[in-house]
């Protein structure tokens, strides 16, 4: 039986971030809608052509999005909240994504356990009419180039519901969507597609079993389209849902064999003879080449159970960059073992070709393939190249529990820490980076300016930022982070064991792209990383300047990590480096140090049974970094896009003096969770959404702060934006901060009056 190949999605931003540039030009009225759509279609066409050239048999299409594919499907199914219905077309689309005219955007949160963000649909009874026209047109264009290889990718109905905020009865919502999905599938059948991928990653969640009846009734309805359905899951295993998922009326079921325990489940339960198994064997979320021996072992086991398989990446390839061959400045032993999207296509095709060209799957025979032998040799060369640091290894071996503890408990530390006005105001750390600031880094990289000239220019930006914060009236200042291209990249560039790409961009959300570092060896800090800029800022003001660090867990979760040692060990190596930085900042006069952990929660395994293991080492890594701080030094941390209710005990164990939170876009849910848990430490309540260009009014901010005061003791509360301000423009930031300070003054007076009346 010939083994076919498939893809489940592809990078969306363009090899040179063409979509990002087009979006930002469109938002600044420098590009019209027609040109924006043309850019997106050109990227789509290039993606299809590449997959066709490589020889992929079933090419997933329709996943490219101007901002977010969940938003795309929300609009197609008429899930449009009333506040956006006065807009139409792209104006409506981007109002939902970014907010407009004082109307807030949809809530944004992380896509499962990845660093991609999606916009949370709000489902009420008032559905708008469906409109699949853009998707159907995409399918037609794909068929023109790809013919029967074109396979539409559709976000599954139960995953769409699971990701949504339901404001109606679940059964009604399922019934509505079920009928409209059937309409869509019939439209696709009329176009002559050979199959449709229904992406249901929600099936790997623990609660999937409770949706069993909904899945069964939904797929019983969808089968009426008489169209082959390919059920796609990824990010983890099916768990307890395995037996009934195998009985769903679909022709192919795809599973992720790079995460979770699907291989063990396959051994236990077998696989139905009437279905094809989609084998997600190439890791769609990391950037390393396959380990031939390991991959062939897995495939040997799978084929001993079912011969009817197709091969594909474990997930969409949107989580990896385009092409590792472009990274010519990386050391050759490292570059040779990298696999970005284009290389992963090659790996899928290679494995299928090797299996199809051999009689049977004996590993010894298969491993004689010259291409697989070459990959083995590349891995051996890399292992000799990858740095090992004996000092770091010794420090890890000698760690004790005392290294993870602050000298005094929180209640005693607080009395020693700086005294500030009630409800002190601050920011999360970064300020807008203009084109001129970004150009400074480019000039330095090209050796067009010296390091001294670069630092002098950065110092001017710091001085301007400090003056601005003083003029606005903030209580605790920051230096603005103008020297940092990215909160992870900046630190990684100064740590041994990290490597950086030139073209390794991936989408975080909308037009925001990041270049995750690559961890390839032991991590150490050769010299201080942030002390110089902190000292410059603190010398310019009598107010406290908060020093800014990125935490070890966020650096792990936002990097492409090693696969030869546990992530926990890599996190502790980073924590040791940050621990030394905290000590140096204290010695330089820092009274407040923020260790950001915005990605703490996103690293949670999708199944709660594995949470404690992750949270144990994640919290320990933070505590190791912060534990060196003196009791009079106030340690802050920041978390965004987080639901805290189910991990609050672990957040408390971080033992941070001040926790700042994303809050405004989640309708205060985060605030309420912290309140319900009886959290005792100080909380920086995110009072406005920095991901929207809208400037919050004083009245809006006053109402937000009143909610905070109603839920937390005033002496617990700090006032800050939701997140860093780097991606905003100065003309948005300045009035927003002024309004925030003005609103805080109003609330301070109300709190004082309330105390006097008590």
From Swiss-Prot:
Binds 1 zinc ion per subunit. L-methionine binds at residues 428-430, 481, 596. Zn(2+) binds at residues 638, 640, 662, 723. It comes from the Bacteria. 5-methyltetrahydropteroyltri-L-glutamate binds at residues 17-20, 110, 512-513, 558, 602. The keyword Metal-binding applies. Pathway: Amino-acid biosynthesis; L-methionine biosynthesis via de novo pathway; L-methionine from L-homocysteine (MetE route): step 1/1. The keyword Methyltransferase applies. Catalyzes the transfer of a methyl group from 5-methyltetrahydrofolate to homocysteine resulting in methionine formation. HAMAP family: Meth_synth (MF_00172). Belongs to the vitamin-B12 independent methionine synthase family. This is 5-methyltetrahydropteroyltriglutamate--homocysteine methyltransferase. It comes from Thermosynechococcus vestitus (strain NIES-2133 / IAM M-273 / BP-1). The gene is metE.
């Amino acid at each position: 039986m010939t083994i076919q190949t498939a893809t489940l999605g592809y990078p969306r931003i363009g090899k040179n971030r063409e979509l990002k540039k087009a979006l930002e030009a469109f938002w600044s009225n420098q590009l019209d809608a027609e040109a924006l759509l043309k850019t997106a279609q050109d990227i789509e066409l290039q993606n299809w052509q590449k997959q066709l050239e490589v020889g992929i048999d079933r090419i997933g299409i329709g996943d490219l999005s101007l901002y977010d594919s969940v938003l795309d499907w929300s609009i197609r199914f008429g899930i449009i909240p009333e506040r956006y219905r006065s807009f139409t077309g792209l104006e409506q689309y981007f109002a939902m994504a970014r907010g407009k005219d004082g109307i807030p955007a949809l809530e944004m949160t992380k896509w499962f356990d990845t660093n991609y963000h999606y916009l949370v649909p709000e489902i009420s009874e008032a559905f708008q009419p469906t409109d699949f026209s853009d998707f159907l047109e995409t399918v037609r264009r794909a068929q023109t180039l790809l013919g029967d290889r074109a396979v539409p990718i559709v976000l599954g109905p139960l995953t769409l519901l699971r990701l949504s905020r339901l404001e109606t009865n679940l059964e009604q919502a399922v019934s509505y969507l079920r009928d409209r999905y059937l309409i869509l599938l019939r439209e696709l059948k009329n176009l002559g597609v050979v199959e449709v991928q229904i992406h249901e990653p929600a099936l790997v969640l623990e609660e999937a079993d409770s949706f069993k009846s909904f899945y069964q009734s939904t797929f019983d309805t969808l089968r009426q389209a008489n169209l082959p359905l390919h059920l796609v899951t990824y990010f983890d295993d099916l768990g307890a849902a395995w037996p009934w998922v195998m009985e769903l009326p679909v022709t192919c079921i795809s599973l992720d064999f790079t995460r979770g325990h699907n291989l063990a489940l396959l051994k236990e339960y077998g696989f139905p003879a009437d279905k094809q198994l989609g084998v997600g064997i190439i890791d769609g979320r990391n950037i390393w080449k396959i380990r031939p021996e390991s991959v062939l072992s897995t495939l040997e086991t799978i084929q001993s159970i079912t011969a009817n398989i197709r091969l594909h990446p474990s997930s969409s390839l949107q989580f990896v960059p385009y092409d590792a061959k472009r990274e010519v400045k990386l050391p050759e032993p490292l570059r040779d073992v990298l696999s970005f999207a284009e290389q992963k296509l090659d790996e899928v095709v290679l494995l299928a070709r090797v299996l199809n060209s051999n009689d049977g799957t004996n590993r010894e025979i298969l491993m004689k393939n010259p291409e697989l032998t070459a990959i083995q040799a590349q891995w051996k060369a890399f292992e000799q190249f990858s740095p090992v640091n004996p000092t770091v290894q010794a420090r890890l071996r000698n760690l004790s529990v005392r290294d993870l503890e602050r000298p005094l408990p929180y209640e005693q530390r607080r009395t020693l820490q700086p005294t500030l006005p009630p409800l002190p105001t601050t920011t999360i750390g970064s300020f807008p980076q203009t084109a001129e600031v970004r150009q400074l880094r480019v000039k330095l990289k090209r050796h067009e300016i010296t390091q001294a000239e670069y630092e002098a220019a950065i110092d001017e930006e710091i001085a301007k930022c400090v003056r601005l914060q003083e003029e606005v009236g903030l209580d605790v200042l920051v230096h603005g982070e103008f020297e940092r291209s990215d909160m992870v990249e900046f630190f990684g560039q100064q740590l041994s064991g990290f490597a950086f790409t030139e073209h390794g961009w991936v989408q975080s959300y909308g037009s925001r792209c990041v270049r995750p570092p690559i961890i390839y060896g032991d991590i150490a800090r050769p010299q201080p990383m942030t002390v110089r800029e902190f000292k410059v800022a603190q010398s310019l003001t009598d107010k406290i300047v908060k020093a800014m660090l990125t935490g070890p867990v966020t650096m792990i979760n936002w990097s492409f990590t090693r696969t030869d040692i546990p992530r926990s060990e890599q996190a502790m190596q980073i924590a040791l480096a940050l621990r030394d930085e905290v000590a140096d900042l204290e010695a330089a006069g820092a009274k407040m140090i923020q260790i950001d952990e915005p990605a703490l929660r996103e690293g949670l395994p999708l199944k709660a049974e594995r949470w404690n293991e992750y949270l144990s080492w994640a919290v320990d890594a933070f505590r190791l970094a912060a534990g060196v701080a003196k009791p009079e030094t106030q340690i802050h941390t920041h978390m965004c896009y987080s639901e805290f209710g189910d991990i609050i005990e672990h957040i408390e164990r971080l033992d941070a003096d001040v926790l700042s939170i994303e809050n405004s876009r989640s309708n205060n849910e985060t605030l309420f969770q912290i309140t319900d848990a009886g959290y005792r430490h100080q909380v920086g309540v995110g009072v406005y959404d920095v991901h929207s260009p809208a400037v919050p009014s004083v009245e809006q901010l006053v109402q937000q702060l009143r909610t905070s005061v109603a839920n937390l003791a005033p002496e617990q509360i700090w006032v800050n934006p939701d997140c860093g301000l780097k991606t905003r423009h100065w003309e948005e930031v300045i009035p927003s901060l002024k309004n925030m300070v003005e609103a805080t003054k109003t609330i301070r007076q109300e709190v004082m009056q309330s105390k006097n009346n008590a």
